[in-house]
Structures are given as structure tokens and as C-alpha cells.
């Protein structure tokens, strides 16, 4: 594993013209989407390809954050573990960035580490969020590549997503933005996406792309009514396994975008 402070090694990697791909995922309110991005990472994983998933802050499975690696000038390999599902796992910050925001210098350091890490992988997925003070993305590299916004099926989510997209546009300019609607069928998700896309076009001049919808596998009990059992599953409840298929569909759409999105070779 390389030393991120080794300038010669970094230059060799840049000269190699890596086609590493970076996909960042952000929650509708500018916050992380931890469990959701894990499922997407598993769906994105392909044979003979290496994938790195970077969480926003330290998880139980990640003993060392990249923030700690940078602070202690430690070997970068200490900040990466092999996940049982087959991808590599790391994390950016030591603590939740909502309560412990990073300094600009540290953001720059972490951005450099992630950029160099990407040369060892085919795909890098970053769980990003908006700074609560500057309202910019955690890493500048996230604004140079694909950004996926996760929103649920609600009017509140549409408003929150609009505010998040507004901040991203104001701070970073033209960023390729895609949307996934969770807790919804494809048709339901498309309806909410169209409403969000319409207001973003009208007021921000931003056009979004719909990646798909992710239903939930949990059964939803019917309301208690006279003469009916409360645990009867409503007809529109999603069947188990549909969630996994929906993630695969989103991963497939992301894969189709590969040839039209920038990579580190041109960043």
C-alpha cells in the first residue's frame, strides 16, 4: 500500500491515467445515508473489480479513520479493512461531522488521500454530507464526480432535497446529480422525483436524473377495523426480495452512466 505523502508515488499514479470511478451518496437533508449506501455497494460490486466504500465517520467495523491516519501520519492500510461481502471499507472522520465538523485544512488532506486511494480501485463510493457551517460537500472530489441523492417518499423530503441541491449548486456549480427515492415503488418514486425535478429546473436551472426507487421489505399491517385483523398485510405491500432487485436496478443504471461521467483520468 502506498504512502499518501510520497509525491513520487502520487505522480506515478497520475501518469498512469487511472479510470477509477467515484460515486458519492448523500441523504436528502445533507446528512449521511449509512445503511443505504452499504446495500448499494453490494449491488455495485462486480467480479474482477475492486470497490472501496468510505463511510462519513467511524463505524464499529472500522477501527481507524482516515482522519486519524492523517493526524498520526500512519500507514494508510490501517484505515482500510476487507468487508465480508467482498469490498474494502474505510471511513473519513473520527466522529459525526454534524457535531464535529472538519477544518478546511483537514478536508484538503482527506481529499488528497481519497484521490490517491482511488487509483487502487475500479469504483470508490463515498458517503458524503454537507458541512453544517459552510454548506459545502465534505470532500471537493465529490463535487467533480457523480452525486446520488437519497430521498424518501414525502413532501418534506422534496423540500429538504431542494434545499440540499440549492446549497450544492451554489457552492460547487454544475454537479451531475441523480436521485433515488426510498420506501416507494418505481411509479411512486418517479412521481416524487418529477415534482423535485420540476422545481429544481424552474428555480435553480438544475436538471436531475432519476435512478430508480427502493421499496421496503417490511410488511405493513392494516389499520384496525371492526371485523378485521390488525396484522392483515395490505395489497400494495412489497414482497420480500424486491428491495434487493431494486438496488440491482439502480446499480445497473449507474453502470450505464459510466461512459458518460468523468473519471480520475480527466479530473
Question: Across the structure, where does each feature detected by a protein language model lie?
Answer:
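Extreme N-terminal, non-catalytic leader segments
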Residues: 1-31, 35, 42-49, 75
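C-terminal lobe/tail of nucleotide-utilizing enzymes
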Residues: 1-18, 174-267
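Phosphate/oxyanion-binding active-site loops and adjacent basic polyanion-contact surfaces
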Residues: 4, 33, 103, 156-160, ...
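Short, high-confidence coil segments that cap the C-terminus of an alpha-helix
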Residues: 20, 49, 121-122, 174
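P-loop/Walker-type NTP enzyme "switch/lid" segment
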Residues: 24-29, 52-120, 225
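Structural motif
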Residues: 25-31, 54-58, 92-95, 127-130, ...
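Histidine-anchored nucleotide/phosphate-binding helix
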Residues: 35-45, 161-170
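Conserved catalytic-core segment of NTP-binding enzymes
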Residues: 116-119, 126-213
Amino acid at each position: 500500500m502506498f504512502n499518501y505523502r510520497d509525491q513520487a508515488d502520487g505522480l506515478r499514479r497520475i501518469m498512469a491515467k487511472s479510470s477509477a470511478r467515484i460515486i458519492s451518496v448523500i441523504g436528502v437533508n445533507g446528512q449521511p445515508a449509512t445503511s443505504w449506501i452499504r446495500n448499494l455497494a453490494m449491488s455495485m460490486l462486480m467480479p474482477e473489480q475492486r470497490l472501496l466504500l468510505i463511510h462519513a465517520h467511524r463505524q464499529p467495523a472500522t477501527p481507524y479513520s482516515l482522519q486519524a491516519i492523517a493526524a498520526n501520519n500512519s500507514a494508510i492500510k490501517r484505515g482500510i479493512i476487507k468487508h465480508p461481502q467482498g469490498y474494502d471499507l474505510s471511513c473519513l472522520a473520527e466522529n459525526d461531522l454534524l457535531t464535529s465538523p472538519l477544518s478546511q485544512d483537514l478536508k484538503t488532506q482527506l481529499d488528497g488521500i481519497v484521490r490517491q486511494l482511488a487509483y487502487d480501485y475500479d469504483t470508490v463510493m463515498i458517503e458524503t454530507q454537507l458541512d453544517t457551517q459552510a454548506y459545502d460537500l465534505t470532500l471537493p472530489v465529490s463535487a467533480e464526480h457523480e452525486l446520488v441523492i437519497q430521498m424518501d417518499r414525502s413532501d418534506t423530503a422534496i423540500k429538504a432535497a431542494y434545499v440540499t441541491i440549492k446549497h450544492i449548486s451554489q457552492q460547487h456549480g454544475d454537479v451531475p446529480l441523480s436521485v433515488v427515492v426510498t420506501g416507494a415503488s418505481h411509479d411512486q418514486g418517479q412521481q416524487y422525483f418529477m415534482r423535485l425535478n420540476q422545481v429544481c429546473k424552474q428555480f435553480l436551472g438544475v436538471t436531475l436524473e432519476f435512478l430508480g426507487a427502493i421499496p421496503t421489505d417490511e410488511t405493513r399491517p392494516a389499520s384496525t377495523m371492526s371485523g378485521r385483523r390488525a396484522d392483515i398485510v395490505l395489497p400494495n405491500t412489497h414482497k420480500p426480495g424486491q428491495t434487493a432487485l431494486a438496488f440491482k436496478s439502480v446499480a445497473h443504471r449507474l453502470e450505464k452512466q459510466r461512459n458518460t461521467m468523468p473519471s480520475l483520468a480527466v479530473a
